[in-house]
Each structure stands twice: as structure tokens, then as C-alpha cells.
A protein has these predicted regions:
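Short extracytoplasmic
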Residues: 39-68
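Exposed beta-sheet edge and beta->alpha loop/turn motif
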Residues: 92-198
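Short N-terminal edge-element motif at the start of the domain
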Residues: 18-26, 156, 174
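Alpha-helical transmembrane signal-anchor/signal-peptide segments
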Residues: 26-42
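Hydrophobic membrane-insertion alpha-helices, especially the h-region
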Residues: 4-24
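Structured domain cores in non-transmembrane regions
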Residues: 57-115
Length: 198
């Protein structure tokens, strides 16, 4: 009986440690660390769990797509691929600066950008996204869509209490061995379009 009283807590402790070590290697743990890094303004931790270069490139592509499809009459109807080739590299740098600046200071830079793809700047698009998520939508959690081939597809699920509608922001994460890293937001343009009517 005495051996059981000694061994049982050790087994429970070992199981808890094993669970934590496995959980640390799951995509949801990485998302918690991204939130923690954002709140604590910890750029090193943020960059461990978010590939800033890949995310910035993703945001730049989404911004061009959003501008060409929905917003800017000046460039609407033009070849989207030509517009993407012209503006995406510069926008990539702009978004990278914005993301890093936000992590360091907790706000988006007020300085404008020289990129003139639309009357709405990249900063305005991200601030609009933040405003909708913080003030108009309720966060319903993360859902894992698929894990395989070194990638995980997740959704950040939101709903609008005023309209009882749901909205999903799709995230792609890459398996880095001992942790997962966000590399893409794949439907930002559709997400922004879907929440504009709120």
C-alpha cells in the first residue's frame, strides 16, 4: 500500500509532464504564445511563433487582392497579376514594418506609406481588422481544420452578436519540429469583405 502511495503521485506527475511536453508541440500552444508575446511586447517570442517575413508577404498579397477586387476603382479592372507584381514587394516591407512596430509599441504607426494602391493604407486595413475583432465581433475560439505534411490549417472563429453571423479567419502554420509557426493568413480579403456590413 505504501508503494502505491509513492508511485501513484510520481506516475501522475510524469503523465502531466509528458502531456505538457506534447501540448507544447501543438499549434494551439503556439497561438497562446503569440498572444502572450503581443501582450508583453516580446518581439523575440513573437518571431519564434510567427514567421514575420512569410506573414508580411501573405498580408501584402491579401491587401492587393482586397484592393483590386473590392475597393479601388482606380485599379479595378486592371490585371491583378500585374498589380501584384508592381506593389507586393513594397507592401511586403510595409507590412513587415507595421507588424514589428505593433509588437514593439502596441499600436500601428501613424506615418503614412508611399504605396498608393488604394485610398486605404495597409495600416488602415489592419486597424479596421483590429477594430472589428475587438469591438464588433466575439471570439469563439480556434478550430483545427487539418494537420498534415508539416502544415496545420486552423481557423480563428468569430461571430457577430448583432447579426448572429459567423466569420472565420484562416491561418496556416508550419511545423518547425518542437513548435509551430504562423506563416500565412489565407483569407484576409474575404474576411474583411464579409465583416464590412457589420
Amino acid at each position: 500500500m505504501r508503494k502505491i502511495l509513492i508511485i501513484a503521485p510520481l506516475l501522475i506527475l510524469m503523465a502531466a509532464i509528458a502531456y505538457f511536453m506534447i501540448y507544447k508541440q501543438m499549434p494551439h500552444y503556439a497561438l497562446q504564445q503569440v498572444e502572450k508575446a503581443t501582450v508583453k511586447r516580446n518581439q523575440a517570442l513573437f518571431e519564434k511563433y510567427v514567421d514575420v517575413d512569410a506573414l508580411s508577404e501573405s498580408l501584402a498579397r491579401q491587401f492587393v487582392s482586397y484592393a483590386t477586387r473590392y475597393k479601388d476603382a482606380e485599379i479595378a479592372g486592371q490585371d491583378p497579376q500585374a498589380i501584384a507584381r508592381e506593389y507586393t514587394p513594397e507592401l511586403n516591407n510595409v507590412f513587415k514594418t507595421i507588424v514589428i512596430d505593433y509588437i514593439q509599441h502596441g499600436k500601428y504607426p501613424s506615418a503614412g506609406t508611399t504605396v498608393t494602391t488604394t485610398k486605404r493604407s495597409p495600416e488602415a486595413m489592419l486597424m479596421q481588422l483590429q477594430d472589428y475583432i475587438v469591438n464588433r465581433l466575439e471570439f469563439a475560439g480556434f478550430s483545427t481544420v487539418r494537420i498534415g505534411d508539416g502544415y496545420a490549417d486552423l481557423t480563428a472563429d468569430f461571430f457577430s452578436p448583432s447579426q448572429t453571423s459567423s466569420h472565420r479567419l484562416e491561418l496556416k502554420m508550419a511545423d518547425k519540429g518542437k513548435y509551430w509557426q504562423i506563416v500565412e493568413i489565407s483569407n484576409l480579403d474575404q474576411f474583411l469583405k464579409s465583416i464590412e456590413s457589420l
